[in-house]
Amino acid sequence: VHGRIRATCGRVLHAPIDPDTLGSALGDLVARPRRDIDSIGGRSPAMLGVRAMLHRYADVDLPVLITGESGTGKELAAHALHELSRRRERPFVAVNCGAIAPTLVQSELFGHERGAFTGATVRRMGLFESADGGTVFLDEIGDLPLEAQTNLLRVLQEGTLERVGSHRPVRVDVRVLAATHVDLDAA
């Protein structure tokens, strides 16, 4: 495992890290070519089938639901779909829907206006706006509260959202990828 991790690293830095060394390492990382999907995973028939499916759906600019048990690489598949798509030069924004406090979900995903609630001292873009032109990955989509699901539907159907505290639609161009480890039909 240690060798496999080391093989995927660009450079190993040891603490304390000199700022110039860190800057150089980050520059090398940015300049490095993006990872090719064919280098991911094994050569089993199942993995070859997964890779073929990722290639097939990468440029289909529709939402994709990725299902599977925890730890099976759903986020890796989402990254691959983004990297293989025409949106690869734009942001990839991932969020675990179960990790956001229910009271903050709307603001985190869709943004808010100044004064929309106590503590909202400035207008803030949500994750969808920050990913404009790119991809939003909603991990554990089944944990998304019902009210946020309604607003997500608007993004999917109309390509617009409303920030919390506003009634003015904001146009967004994002591809939505979602993942879950549960059977959503049975949930």
Name each region found by the language model:
Residues 1-35:
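N-terminal accessory segments that target, anchor, or regulate ATP-driven/P-loop NTPase machines
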Residues 34-171, 176-183, 187:
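AAA+ ATPase active-site-proximal loops
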